[in-house]
């Protein structure tokens, strides 16, 4: 239900076009939308029932603002500006820097071809986009051999290497007539638009003549050029009977997710397909319109001659903003292309859902399998503990956290044991459990739903003893037991330490296995780090003149014996260490190294 403050603002909304900004309790803009009628659109958020992401959006709205515009077109433009400025959480946002390469013919006296990643209004001719840099480079290399322009830096008084190779018209040493450039550029444009039959026939004739003249290297080069045409141009499926450059957008919506497909059609061929997936909160037509305008604004790309979209969008306004026709075909080839894009969008979204289901079975589903097997309420967080030591010395413990079946590494913790000086699993468990949960209680932090101990009944009962008898906590605790091959086997749980078997092929079993492996890895890694540090410190302590302060300076600055050994005297003395002590360090470590 809307607050009294919002109800008052709703009553004042005008019947005019504009943009609205939804805000949360912190006055952050969480959604920007446009409306032909602000009063109707904004009121619909609070006067209708919603599901999914829209319901979540509405639940977070604490206030809203709006800006009236003079037309729908202005509202479109303002919406894009506001989205890019505030990056609201619930809006579809496109990442910058995701453009594709283009081939450019420069607008110069002696034009040249190059690959660029953005389009500028500089009078140049741009063709693309290409699916990747490799495809653009392959095309450029072909054009430079077959339709050369200028490859050198310009006039230098003598022919360049490329001129001798037939890949430059000679601006390096002579005046090249504009007509000659114009002819070449016309041929390049024709080729890029898909007219390849003439050049293929010409190349085949040249290859035949080169072979007859026994110029086999040249013939092989021409053969490669013909091969490029065959595999790169001719084998692309022709999907349109006209060569108009066009982009095509369509979508599929299901379960609050929007799947968008973009087809790039050039040279009567589908040269590139993009797909995007977004959870959406509002009207799909508004979201798609916003996406299309951001798409062209962010990519700073060459606009096609035509954009095809599904019905329901305001084509007229988008066409005015973009400066190219935006059309919805009703029949024929273009309509079929739109249907193809929609079919692809549906396939992409269904694949997304299947992956989400699989991920859920491995995470939250696996967590539920474990809690069901133990007969405890469903939960979200598991904390697992393991100990590590070397022959009873340098005792440490480690804790890993899994939330909804996924490792939460920022919650991992390491413990140097303070009250245990020998290998004692029960004492080690008591100390680490006591330290962990006393702290959580003092800081009033949330407790886990399940604790797993890597070990058997010794660790399990020690943990339960501290939790119940010292801290009055009743967190479920289970032990992770391994078989004789040191592989995850069962859980032990309950007052009688009963064995709880999980199906070895179940996701719950795999999750226990991952947790056990992860806590063991984390404990071993911590122990090795500590051992290496202690070993290094002890070796430095044996050097005459090196006390705790000097040792800590060396450790902090160099980090390892090898780095200290490789340092020169000056570097050691710069730490404030006397020359005599520095020399002793160098000599001692040198002897030790040998």
Curated annotation (Swiss-Prot):
InterPro entries: GIY-YIG_endonuc, GIY-YIG_endonuc_sf, GIY-YIG_UvrC_Cho, RuvA_2-like, UVR_dom, UVR_dom_sf, UvrABC_protein_C, UvrC. Its main location: cytoplasm. It is found in: Cytoplasm. One of its GO terms (biological process) is nucleotide-excision repair. GO terms for molecular function: DNA binding; excinuclease ABC activity. Residues 197-232 form the UVR domain. Pfam families: GIY-YIG (PF01541), HHH_5 (PF14520), UVR (PF02151), UvrC_RNaseH (PF22920), UvrC_RNaseH_dom (PF08459). One of its GO terms (cellular component) is excinuclease repair complex. Keywords: Cytoplasm, DNA damage, DNA excision, DNA repair, Excision nuclease, SOS response. Signal peptide: none annotated. Gene3D superfamilies: 5' to 3' exonuclease, C-terminal subdomain, GIY-YIG endonuclease, UVR domain, UvrC, RNAse H endonuclease domain. Residues 15-92 form the GIY-YIG domain. Interacts with UvrB in an incision complex. HAMAP family: UvrC. The UvrABC repair system catalyzes the recognition and processing of DNA lesions. UvrC both incises the 5' and 3' sides of the lesion. The N-terminal half is responsible for the 3' incision and the C-terminal half is responsible for the 5' incision. Belongs to the UvrC family. PANTHER family: UVRABC SYSTEM PROTEIN C, UVRC/OXIDOREDUCTASE. This is UvrABC system protein C.
């Amino acid at each position: 239900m809307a607050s009294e403050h919002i109800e008052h603002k709703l009553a004042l909304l005008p019947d005019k076009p504009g943009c609205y900004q939804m805000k949360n309790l912190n006055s952050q803009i969480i959604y920007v939308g446009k409306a032909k009628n602000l009063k109707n659109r904004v009121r619909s958020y609070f006067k209708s029932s919603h599901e999914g992401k829209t319901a979540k959006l509405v639940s977070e709205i604490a206030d809203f603002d709006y800006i009236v515009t003079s037309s729908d077109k202005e509202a479109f433009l303002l919406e894009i500006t506001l989205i890019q400025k505030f990056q609201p959480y619930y809006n579809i946002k496109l990442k910058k820097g995701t453009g594709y390469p283009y081939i450019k013919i420069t607008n110069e006296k002696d034009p040249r071809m190059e690959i660029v990643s953005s389009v500028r209004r500089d009078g140049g001719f741009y063709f693309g986009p290409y699916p990747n840099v490799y495809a653009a480079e392959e095309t450029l290399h072909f054009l430079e051999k077959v339709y050369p322009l200028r490859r050198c830096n310009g006039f230098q008084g003598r022919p360049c290497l490329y001129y001798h190779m037939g890949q430059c018209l000679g601006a390096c040493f002579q005046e090249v007539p504009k007509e000659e450039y114009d002819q070449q550029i016309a041929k390049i444009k024709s080729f890029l638009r898909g007219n390849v039959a003439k050049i293929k026939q010409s190349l085949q004739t040249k290859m035949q003549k080169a072979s007859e003249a026994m110029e086999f290297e040249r013939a092989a080069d021409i053969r490669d050029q013909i091969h490029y045409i065959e595999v790169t141009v001719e084998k692309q499926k022709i999907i349109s009977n006209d060569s108009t450059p066009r982009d095509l957008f369509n979508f599929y919506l299901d379960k609050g997710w929007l799947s968008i497909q973009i087809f790039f059609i050039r040279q009567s061929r589908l040269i590139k397909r993009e797909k995007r997936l977004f959870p959406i909160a509002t009207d799909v037509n508004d979201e798609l319109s916003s996406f299309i305008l951001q798409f062209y604004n962010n990519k700073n790309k060459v606009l096609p001659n035509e954009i095809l979209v599904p019905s329901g969008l305001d084509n007229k306004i988008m066409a005015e903003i973009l400066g190219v026709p935006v059309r919805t075909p009703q029949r024929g080839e273009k309509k079929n292309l739109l249907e193809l894009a929609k079919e692809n969008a549906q396939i992409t979204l269904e694949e997304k859902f299947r992956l989400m289901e699989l991920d859920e079975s491995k995470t939250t589903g696996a967590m539920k399998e474990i809690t069901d097997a133990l007969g405890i309420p469903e939960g979200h967080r598991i904390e697992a503990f393991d100990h590590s030591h070397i022959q009873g010395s340098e005792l440490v413990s480690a804790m890993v956290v899994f939330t909804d079946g996924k490792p939460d590494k920022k919650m991992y913790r390491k413990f140097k044991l303070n009250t245990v000086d020998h290998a004692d699993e029960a004492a080690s468990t008591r100390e680490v459990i006591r330290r962990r949960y006393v702290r959580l209680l003092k800081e009033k932090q949330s407790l886990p739903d399940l604790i797993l101990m890597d070990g058997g009944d010794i660790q399990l009962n020690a943990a339960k003893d501290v939790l119940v008898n010292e801290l009055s906590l009743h967190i479920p605790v289970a032990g992770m037991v391994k078989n004789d091959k040191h592989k995850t086997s069962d859980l032990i749980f309950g007052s009688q330490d009963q064995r709880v078997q999980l199906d070895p092929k179940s996701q719950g079993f795999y999750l226990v296995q991952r947790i056990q492996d992860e806590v063991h890895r984390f404990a071993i890694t911590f122990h090795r780090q500590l051992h290496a540090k202690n070993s290094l410190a002890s070796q430095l302590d044996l050097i005459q003149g090196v006390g705790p302060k000097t040792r800590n300076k060396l450790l902090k600055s160099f980090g390892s014996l090898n780095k200290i050994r490789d340092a020169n005297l000056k570097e050691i003395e710069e730490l404030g260490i006397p020359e005599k002590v520095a020399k002793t360090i160098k000599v001692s470590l040198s002897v030790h190294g040998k």
